Amino acid sequence: MGGQSSKIGTCCSHKTTALEAPDVENKENGEVNGVHSFREYSLEQLKIATSCFALENVVSEHGETAPNVVYQGKLENHMKIAIKRFSGTAWPDPRQFLEEARLVGQLRSKRMANLLGYCCEGGERLLVAEFMPNETLAKHLFHWDTEPMKWAMRLRVALYISEALEYCSNNGHTLYHDLNAYRVLFDEECNPRLSTFGLMKNSRDGKSYSTNLAFTPPEYLRTGRITAESVIYSFGTLLLDLLTGKHIPPSHALDLIRDRNLQTLTDSCLEGQFSDSDGTELVRLTSCCLQYEARERPNIKSLVTALISLQKDTEVLSHVLMGLPQSGTFASPPSPFAEACSGKDLTSMVEILEKIGYKDDEDLSFMWTEQMQEAINSKKKGDIAFRRKDFSEAIEFYTQFLDLGMISATVLVRRSQSYLMSNMAKEALDDAMKAQGISPVWYVALYLQSAALSVLGMEKESQIALTEGSILEARKISASTQN
């Protein structure tokens, strides 16, 4: 990378015409059709969607210890959502919270995980956004499992996030709070998107930055306020993450840049993937964004223009570059249960459920062994009917068992399967979702949901449930082989 190092000294301020691009209307990352309109959700809806904000559904960076926790959930229409739950004192004035949320909720872009709605009941303050199923940039960049992120994909992340910020700026949202690798999410097709949660502060009077002070813009440390230029600085730290594959303080990176020590700066995993000129150009852009004086940093439009010219392998889909399966595909060959579900082979599904038995209900066995004899007898009669393929009778006895207040995910999936065999797909779906509420990581419940959704003609939702079930089953198998 040494041959072009002299370029580094030239910075792209917002006055530099070489990086300027004309305004482009109707860009691909503009308004997106098909995204639900911003709306209000009831607290009860969100409790059901998250199994009462169960720990298993926490997806935020610091888990349940974070002051504002993000959960994954599923609505009654089977759409997956992300829910940010603010701390009790974050937004005491509900009107102010609603006003801020509505402004962000007007944005609709393919480059963002769009805000779908809010909940403002009592002391609760919650935001609802599109769910992105393929983790965060931090996960893929700092904690990768099989292979590091490729150079072409890193450039794509940089471009897409810059386009997201440009879209926000063009629509009156010039400030983004605490931009970092955890704010970059990957959708079903593994395309990077910017979380809309960062467009609202964590509280009415709260801090705009929660990360280590070494990564915050210098002017924020001086004044406690952020500007559009502060967002550019944070974008520079993101470029630095992409360049190094590590989360290193900007001051250290700038020292390496000044010393022309670029070999130490760049991620060794990227060796041979880019030219000296391309590597030097990204280093230059990073350095420009990290300038101490805010006025010396480039504007977002010039960064978009510069990053467009660096793009590689633009014809290759993101999920291919990432080495991840596209939504609706399996990372490994499907299991017999997944194959039966995918092929709508209900008879084989019954046989597999019989083999599984009640081993996944072991934690709950005390609930019936110490309960009234009537409940035990009802379950046993239901099991006998299920084995005899008398599904009408199985439904009757399993219903008796559940009506007595018993809790069993296995009984619910068996009744769900019985409903499927009796051409009662809606009832089957309801039971499968209840089973998942009891055991959120049990793949069987998702397979039953997939089968029921397919019968109901909801093929896209069926395929998503099937893929999620396959992933959970693979994780369970992997965990069992490691023990």
UniProtKB/Swiss-Prot annotation:
GO terms for biological process: brassinosteroid mediated signaling pathway. The active site is at residue 178. It comes from the Eukaryota. Keywords: ATP-binding, Brassinosteroid signaling pathway, Cell membrane, Kinase, Lipoprotein, Membrane, Myristate, Nucleotide-binding, Serine/threonine-protein kinase, Transferase. ATP binds at residues 62-70, 84. A lipid is attached at residue 2 (N-myristoyl glycine). It is found in: Cell membrane. The keyword Phosphoprotein does not apply. Residues 56-322 form the Protein kinase domain. GO terms for molecular function: ATP binding; protein serine kinase activity; protein serine/threonine kinase activity. Belongs to the protein kinase superfamily. Ser/Thr protein kinase family. Probable serine/threonine kinase that acts as a positive regulator of brassinosteroid (BR) signaling downstream of the receptor kinase BRI1. Functions redundantly with BSK3, BSK6, BSK7 and BSK8. This is Serine/threonine-protein kinase BSK4. The gene is BSK4.
